[in-house]
From Swiss-Prot:
GO cellular component, one term: cytosolic large ribosomal subunit
GO annotation, biological process: translation
Name of protein: Large ribosomal subunit protein bL35
InterPro entries cross-referenced by the UniProt entry: Ribosomal_bL35, Ribosomal_bL35-like, Ribosomal_bL35_CS, Ribosomal_bL35_sf
Record keywords: Ribonucleoprotein, Ribosomal protein
Native species: Syntrophus aciditrophicus (strain SB)
GO molecular function, one term: structural constituent of ribosome
Family note: Belongs to the bacterial ribosomal protein bL35 family.
Length: 65
C-alpha cells in the first residue's frame, strides 16, 4: 500500500491539539474590517475547535500531523 500524502492546503490551515481535536482559525478576518466592531475583530483573532461533523474529513487530509 502506498504512503498517504498530506493535503498541503489543509496542513497550513489546521492543527491537531494534544487530545486529537482539530484547531482552526475564524473566517471573515482578512478584509472589510471597518464595519466590524473591535470586540468582533478581537474574537476573530482567536482560534477555535473544528466541529465534530467536519473532523473526520479533515483528519483524512492530514494523516501525519
Amino acid at each position: 500500500m502506498p504512503k498517504l500524502k498530506t493535503h498541503r492546503g489543509a496542513a497550513k490551515r489546521f492543527k491537531l491539539t494534544g487530545s486529537g481535536k482539530v484547531r482552526r482559525h475564524h473566517a471573515n478576518a482578512s478584509h472589510i474590517m471597518t464595519t466590524k466592531t473591535t470586540k468582533r475583530k478581537r474574537n476573530l483573532r482567536k482560534s477555535t475547535i473544528l466541529d465534530k461533523r467536519d473532523e473526520k474529513g479533515i483528519k483524512r487530509l492530514i494523516p501525519y500531523l
